[in-house]
């Protein structure tokens, strides 16, 4: 090649390099622009697409006002470790704007801090804005002052209501935007909800209901925040808003989105039933919850939210009428933020199993086969690949069924679904729990409970207030959500010859009330009490009363247990005495309701003076504990309980009232309202450690007791633990889903040892000190209540003690060889174990400590691997759309 040719070649090479460099830079710029365009959340008929990536969303409801900022980090950490990637919360209008135009975002109400903390922990947020939330929360989250806005009607096409709602919505969303908390700004909020379960009331408002719901949808969409919006239980969710399901079994009850390009979202999967005073205990099994989740995802579901994941506490006066202070205690994280096992662990495992199916669920084609009256297979296959995931379902509630799928037999326990992420390997069954179980215990703090000395201050009973009305006033209007109490007084003159002559006849005072409770005094003497219930707020007080000749003064204390939280025309709900009469007079029944002067006084003296605070307590004269009359305040000081365990106060032989610690409202208690089982609905009441001062310091406890004759001596402070842990694993169960991982389209084992194991772990810093029960055979019962069957391996306890005592973590192979057992070959055997954990003084055996640490690190590595695998599997939206178009 000549010199000139070489020069021309070099020149062309340089030119080509320059061109390629320009193309590369343009490509990078374009790629960068594409990434910027991907920021935010969109959706299609398959799922939400977050920052360009599809996600299976496992969400849990955690309400910031129902726990404390001190508790938030632990709760969010446990949610993340439990397999959640999203936290859902309502926004509580009435705590943020208790008075019109005056806002509160401090302490438990610091919404921004809560959302930022969730973001720091790597989770998404779903924000349910209201304005109405229900949530068994006082007034459904609507501020009381809204009732007194002229011409207002809630939740309809009413200008005053819409005006205040829009101002509130713009206030909250403006705060979120200013703090850059929306996903489109790089924040965690991926989804918003406006209104709540509106279909339940829409018919009551006729065409104005439809107009209102369209107005609400337009309001949030017009703000262009870069996230989708949902309406739950709103079949006709307008425009681009997604209609979502609430319920226990949305996989079977939800007809699906109202447009084919909207994803299937489940905003409330109820983990239990909320409780009201007078209720017996209720629960929802984790097997049923897991079944519902697997069923939903097998039918094109891509998002589930557990309502609640942590219920927490209705502190102060925040609960709706008759709702207990403890809220959704049977959730995966209980009232105290402790893991309720096996609910916590078994749901963690279903999340992991479903994540192993993600490729097939997003990019596979659904096929379904009905194999019998109760059995079904639903599976997703991606054409041209080996990607496949199957859900084998047995809906029979009594019988086990065997089915054949792709040439292989599978045994399905009753009412269960098996998940096969590769259409071959069972990694999880909803009815077979390999996760740990636990039992909660309340242990009396002897040091704190000992020697409590109470002082008392009794309320003055107003005998006759200045008459301000000819009829009794409405109780909500009188109290204005500032207090639960309002006095009604009137007088009646009875002539001597109007009393009955016949022996045994007495005059009766009858008070018909719209709710919720009342206490009656006649001439300053206690005459009795009465109350309604959640299902029937109205009730009647009717008792014989010793009226005197001449003027008689009647004092009635109307009592609320919270404001209503649901239904149409909430602004027109009423409570309090509605009809008052005296029966048994010679002259006949005397009606005192109308044309009788009634005086009214909202609140109690102790409330107005804030005797539950240190400063306020100095404004009244406290006396030594003596005769325990109704409407009495009791005060004592107690030392902060030892250790770090959660704390509660046990109100065993008390009646009904309110509790404060260091001036902070713990909540309403009601021990005298017994369930059909003859027990109070709630006995222990949570006192967060952040409400108390440091260890060994004194705290002020104040109790307002409405009823007479209570036993203060029965009050205890208790420490809460879940130090009793159990395992209950059948030898025919699949190995833990944590034993599997995905490599491309394949599901492969994580380790060489793939034997089924019963695994238990004590709380941090504790070790197993006692094996309380062990049986490999046919034991019955549950954690805390196991019973030996007829066939149990003789070495059961010996084997468990050898493997577990002195350790924080232990695993036992569930096999006959482990126990040297050849008996009862005809039965499928179960290993049931119950052990006690304690914090032991002195050093743990170093070998066991190292083994425990290795096991813990292995668990953490499993979680990290799962996240890495998810990252590999995520593809951008364009690729997924191209794939769908090709199909």
Swiss-Prot record:
Active site: 197, 268
Presence of keyword Secreted: yes
Keywords noted in UniProt: Apoplast, Glycoprotein, Glycosidase, Hydrolase, Secreted, Signal
Location(s), subcellular: Secreted, Extracellular space, Apoplast
Pfam families (alphabetical): BetaGal_gal-bd, GHD, Glyco_hydro_35, SUEL_Lectin
Biased composition regions of type Acidic residues, renumbered to the chain: 853-871
One annotated GO molecular function: carbohydrate binding
Known catalytic reactions: Hydrolysis of terminal non-reducing beta-D-galactose residues in beta-D-galactosides
List of glycosylated residues: 269, 300, 395, 785
Listed InterPro entries: BetaGal_gal-bd, Galactose-bd-like_sf, GHD, Gly_Hdrlase_35_cat, Glyco_hydro_35_CS, Glycoside_Hdrlase_35, Glycoside_hydrolase_SF, Lectin_gal-bd_dom
All residue ranges annotated as the SUEL-type lectin domain in the record: 752-838
Disordered as annotated region, ranges: 838-887
Compositionally skewed regions (Basic and acidic residues) per UniProt: 838-852, 872-887
Signal peptide: 1-31
Similarity comment text for this entry: Belongs to the glycosyl hydrolase 35 family.
Protein's UniProt name: Beta-galactosidase 14
Originating species: Arabidopsis thaliana
């Amino acid at each position: 090649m000549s010199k000139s040719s070489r020069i021309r070649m070099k020149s062309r090479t340089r030119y080509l390099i320059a061109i390629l460099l320009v193309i590369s830079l343009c490509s990078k710029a374009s790629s960068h622009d594409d990434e910027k365009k991907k920021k935010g959340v969109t959706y299609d008929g398959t799922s939400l697409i977050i920052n360009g990536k599809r996600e299976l969303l496992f969400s849990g409801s955690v309400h910031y006002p129902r726990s404390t900022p001190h508790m938030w980090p632990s709760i969010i950490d446990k949610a993340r470790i439990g397999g959640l990637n999203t936290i859902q919360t309502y926004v509580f209008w009435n705590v943020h704007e208790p008075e019109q135009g005056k806002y509160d975002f401090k302490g438990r109400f610091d919404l921004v801090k809560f959302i930022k903390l969730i973001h720091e922990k790597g989770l998404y947020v779903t924000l349910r804005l209201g304005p109405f939330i229900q949530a068994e929360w006082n007034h459904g989250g609507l501020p009381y002052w809204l009732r007194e806005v002229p011409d207002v009607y809630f939740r309809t096409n009413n200008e005053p209501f819409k005006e205040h709602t829009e101002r509130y919505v713009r206030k909250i969303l403006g705060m979120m935007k200013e703090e850059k908390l929306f996903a489109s700004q790089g924040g965690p909020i991926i989804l918003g909800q406006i209104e709540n379960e509106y279909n339940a009331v829409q018919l009551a408002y006729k065409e104005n209901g439809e107009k209102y719901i369209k107005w609400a949808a337009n309001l949030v969409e017009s703000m262009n925040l870069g996230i989708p919006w949902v309406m739950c239980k709103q079949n006709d969710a307008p425009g681009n808003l997604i209609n979502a399901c609430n319920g226990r079994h949305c996989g079977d009850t939800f007809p699906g989105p109202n447009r084919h390009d909207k994803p299937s979202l489940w905003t409330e999967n109820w983990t239990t039933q909320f409780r009201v005073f007078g209720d017996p205990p209720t629960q929802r099994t984790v097997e049923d919850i897991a079944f519902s989740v697997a069923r939903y995802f097998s039918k094109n579901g891509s998002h589930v939210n557990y309502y609640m994941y942590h219920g927490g506490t209705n502190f102060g006066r925040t609960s709706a009428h008759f709702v207990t202070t403890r809220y959704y205690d049977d959730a995966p994280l209980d009232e105290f933020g402790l893991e309720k096992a096996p609910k916590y662990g078994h749901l963690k495992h279903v999340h992991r199993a479903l994540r192993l199916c993600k490729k097939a669920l997003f990019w596979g084609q659904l096929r379904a086969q009905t194999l019998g009256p109760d059995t079904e297979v639903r599976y997703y296959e991606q054409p041209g690949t080996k990607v496949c995931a199957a859900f084998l379902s047995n809906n029979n509630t009594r019988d086990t069924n065997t089915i054949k799928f792709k040439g292989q037999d599978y045994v399905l326990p009753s009412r269960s679904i098996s998940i096969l992420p590769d259409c071959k390997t069972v990694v999880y069954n909803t009815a077979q729990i390999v996760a740990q179980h636990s039992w909660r215990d309340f242990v009396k703090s002897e040091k704190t409970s000992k020697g409590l000395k109470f002082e008392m201050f009794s309320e003055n009973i107003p005998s006759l207030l200045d008459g301000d009305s000819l009829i009794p006033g409405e109780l909500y209007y009188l109290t204005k959500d500032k207090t639960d109490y309002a006095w009604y007084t009137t007088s009646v003159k009875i002539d001597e010859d109007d009393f009955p002559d016949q022996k045994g006849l007495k005059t009766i005072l009858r008070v018909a009330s719209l709710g919720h409770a009342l206490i009656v005094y006649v001439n300053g003497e206690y005459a009795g009490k009465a109350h309604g219930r959640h299902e029937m707020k109205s009730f009647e007080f009717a008792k014989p009363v010793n009226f005197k000749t001449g003027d008689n003064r009647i004092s009635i204390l109307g009592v609320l247990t919270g404001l209503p939280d649901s239904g149409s025309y909430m602004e027109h709900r009423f409570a309090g005495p509605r009809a008052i009469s005296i029966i048994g007079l010679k002259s006949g029944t005397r009606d005192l309701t109308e044309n009788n002067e009634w005086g009214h006084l909202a609140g109690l003296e102790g409330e107005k003076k804030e005797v539950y605070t240190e400063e306020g307590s100095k404004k009244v004269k406290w006396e030594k504990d003596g005769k325990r009359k109704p409407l009495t305040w009791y005060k004592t000081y107690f030392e902060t309980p030892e250790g770090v365990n959660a704390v509660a106060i046990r109100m065993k032989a008390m009646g009904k009232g309110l509790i404060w610690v260091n001036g902070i409202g713990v909540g309403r208690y009601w021990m005298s309202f017994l369930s059909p089982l003859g027990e109070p609905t709630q006995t222990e009441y949570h006192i967060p450690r952040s409400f108390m001062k440091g260890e060994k310091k004194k705290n002020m406890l104040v109790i307002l007791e409405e009823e007479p004759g209570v036993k203060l001596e029965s009050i205890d402070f208790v420490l809460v633990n879940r130090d009793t842990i159990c395992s209950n694993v059948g030898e025919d169960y699949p190995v833990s889903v944590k034993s599997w991982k995905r490599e491309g389209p394949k599901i492969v084992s994580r380790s060489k040892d793939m034997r089924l194991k019963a695994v238990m772990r004590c709380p941090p810093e504790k070790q197993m000190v006692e094996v309380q029960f062990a049986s490999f055979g046919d034991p019955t019962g549950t954690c805390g209540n196991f019973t030996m069957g007829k066939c149990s391996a003789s070495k059961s306890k010996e084997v468990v003690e050898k493997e577990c005592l002195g350790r924080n973590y232990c695993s036992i192979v569930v096999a006959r060889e482990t126990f040297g057992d050849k008996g009862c070959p005809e039965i499928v055997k179960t290993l049931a174990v119950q052990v006690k954990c304690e914090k032991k003084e002195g050093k743990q055996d170093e070998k066991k400590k190292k083994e425990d640490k290795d096991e813990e690190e292995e668990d953490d590595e499993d979680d990290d691997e799962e996240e890495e695998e998810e990252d590999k599997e995520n593809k951008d939206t364009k690729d997924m759309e191209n794939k769908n178009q090709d199909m």
